[in-house]
Amino acid sequence: MPKMKTKSAAKKRFKITASGKVKAAAAGKRHGMIKRTNKFIRDARGTMVLAEPDGRKVVKNYLPNGL
């Protein structure tokens, strides 16, 4: 059976760290930022680490061969 292909959309959105955790950009910052708090805007600036169950799902379904 051939290898599963990596999903191109997931390749652009997620990164796997050396320890195996999955990093992604924070959500909710495309528009409507005027009503957000300054703390939210600061926190959403960088990346976040996905929760363990979500990270496992992303790797299993979308990034089977890593990056």
From Swiss-Prot:
A Gene Ontology biological process term = translation
Highest taxon in the source lineage: Bacteria
* UniProt-recorded name of the protein: Large ribosomal subunit protein bL35
| PROSITE patterns xrefs | RIBOSOMAL_L35 (PS00936)
The question of whether Ribosomal protein is a record keyword is answered with yes
GO terms under cellular component: cytosolic large ribosomal subunit
GO molecular function terms noted in the UniProt entry: structural constituent of ribosome
Please tell me whether the keyword Ribosomal protein is annotated for this protein: yes
- Segments crossing the lipid bilayer: none
Q: Which organism is it from?
A: Rhizobium etli (strain ATCC 51251 / DSM 11541 / JCM 21823 / NBRC 15573 / CFN 42)
